[in-house]
Amino acid sequence: MILGWTQRIFTLLVVVTLLAACADEVVNPPKELADIEEKFSVQSSWVEVIGQGDEEKFNSLSPALWQDKIITADVDGLITAFDIKSGKVIWETNLKQPLSGGVTANAGLVAVGTKNAQVHVLDVNDGKQLWHVNVTTEVLAKPAISDGRLVVRTPDGRIFAYSLATQKQEWFYDRIIPNLTLRGTSAAVATSGVVITGFANGKMAAFNLRTGDMLWEQSISAPRGSSEISRIVDVDSTPVVYSNYLYAAGFNGFAIAMDLTNGRYLWREDASVTEELLVDARRVYLVDTKGRIVALDRITGEEVWTQEGLLYRKPTGAADNQDYVVVGDFEGYLHWLDKSTGEFVARIHLDRYGIGGTPIVTDEHVIATTRYGYIHVLENPLATSSEE
């Protein structure tokens, strides 16, 4: 009993010491937005409440697209399908479970993970619940649906693969993770019979989608500091496959390009990234943990430009909008940047709650969700100008 109370007092002292140390740290103020010369204006199409948001928790509940539908989720379990043009609700399903992972829509199905360690699969056309599976812990990343399989990545280092036909588990992978990690998980990407994902130990690995056999493994982050916090090396951003190459980035690590077939490096550059990457034919666009937006040459990894206008404004990952990239920030702004120069060319303020997750761009629309549970669908300014 005495030992128990001693341990509690010691733990309390450690917590107080850590809090005091945090209080002494310099907090970097978010950079004030500078005036810009806008090349085009951006107009709203419709706005709807999509359920209960919860600041940082809502950030992971990004929507999914399926044909003419936007499928959204809220933290209390409400799944909603909207018509992308009108904003009309097509169907609603309440799972009555707290959701913690983003929505995936593919092969006529919707999949979403819960805080209660389940993944639910619904019919994309009417929202009917078809089946669910139990995993080992809450699901923070979007599930993947590919080649007749559902692939789930959990923050305890595990990967589960299920048959869509039988709903049975086909294979399972377990990886030991560090004691201290970021709250987040790299989503699994399933393509061309391969599953790729990052882990909290700074490694990226590829697996055979059918058998679960590991094809290769590569480090993209390595512990560098002396303290446990400074040695966090999570790979939380989702890898991107482009033209037989894999692009990824880690926290306190590197941005990398590697051969998808064998994991060999094409290039590797210092970076600290937790947001999603954007890759096009010429460049890789990343947002680092300080809020810098950086464009790298896709083939060489050389820096093309860096934009520091959103320092410490918690910018989202970048979305592709023809000759521009789109990012959101913590005050609810969407920003358009020129892909060639990194200069700001347009801006719109949606609301004061902050943008949750990387925007989504289609031919006709730009879609953004806010951290308190709103969805904003804008007219794509490039589509409008092309029609005129």
UniProtKB/Swiss-Prot annotation:
Gene3D superfamilies: YVTN repeat-like/Quinoprotein amine dehydrogenase (2.130.10.10). Residues 1-21 form the signal peptide. It comes from the Bacteria. Keywords: Cell outer membrane, Lipoprotein, Membrane, Palmitate, Signal. SUPFAM superfamilies: Quinoprotein alcohol dehydrogenase-like. One of its GO terms (biological process) is Gram-negative-bacterium-type cell outer membrane assembly. The keyword Ribosomal protein does not apply. A lipid is attached at C22 (S-diacylglycerol cysteine). Pfam families: PQQ_2 (PF13360). A lipid is attached at C22 (N-palmitoyl cysteine). It is a lipid-anchor. It is found in: Cell outer membrane. GO terms for cellular component: cell outer membrane. Belongs to the BamB family. Part of the outer membrane protein assembly complex, which is involved in assembly and insertion of beta-barrel proteins into the outer membrane. Part of the Bam complex. HAMAP family: OM_assembly_BamB (MF_00923). This is Outer membrane protein assembly factor BamB. It comes from Kangiella koreensis (strain DSM 16069 / JCM 12317 / KCTC 12182 / SW-125). The lineage of its organism: Bacteria, Pseudomonadati, Pseudomonadota, Gammaproteobacteria, Kangiellales.
